[in-house]
């Protein structure tokens, strides 16, 4: 197990009252959190969102991406479902870090797409490690989920980590004129699915 559960507390939100649980990676001491809602002890697959940290989208309301509205929509879907989990995966900027993300934005301002910008800075298109999220689910005693995502790579990695994904639930929100190139690039180069149906 790559991390351990270290703290928890009640977290009232606009959408409902969650439990916030903090986790710390054993080797790096990086922190991640999970928000859980409702009774998760049943046998039905749990609606789950893995949301990668995005300070600019989540907290500063940037329209360069769809992250902020994905976060709020996922929390709403979970409360409407009556149970669920949101893992806040703290690997900013597809895990290149906040300052490099700002550098990548500057390159995008000069014509690069989101993948090219990362590569120009010496990174892979996506540096994230989703096995951490699988370990969080295991620490929560969750084996079977319905995953809120447009990214099939998350499903593949979770399945390899022995988390059963029974359904991909699309989360297609937040497209606007300022992020349309970004979303098109994610579909073309990163394989994200912006269809209502799982493929």
UniProtKB/Swiss-Prot annotation:
MF annotations from Gene Ontology: GTP binding; GTP cyclohydrolase II activity; zinc ion binding
Disulfide linkage: none
Active-site annotation: 126, 128
Top-tier EC class: hydrolase
EC numbers, comma separated: 3.5.4.25
Cofactor note: Binds 1 zinc ion per subunit.
UniProt keyword Transmembrane helix present: no
Metabolic or biological pathway, per its Swiss-Prot or TrEMBL entry: Cofactor biosynthesis; riboflavin biosynthesis; 5-amino-6-(D-ribitylamino)uracil from GTP: step 1/4
Annotated Pfam families: GTP_cyclohydro2 (PF00925)
Cofactor: Zn(2+)
Keywords per UniProt: GTP-binding, Hydrolase, Metal-binding, Nucleotide-binding, Riboflavin biosynthesis, Zinc
Biological role: Catalyzes the conversion of GTP to 2,5-diamino-6-ribosylamino-4(3H)-pyrimidinone 5'-phosphate (DARP), formate and pyrophosphate.
Listed name of the protein: GTP cyclohydrolase-2
Naturally occurring in which organism (per UniProt): Blochmanniella floridana
Gene: ribA
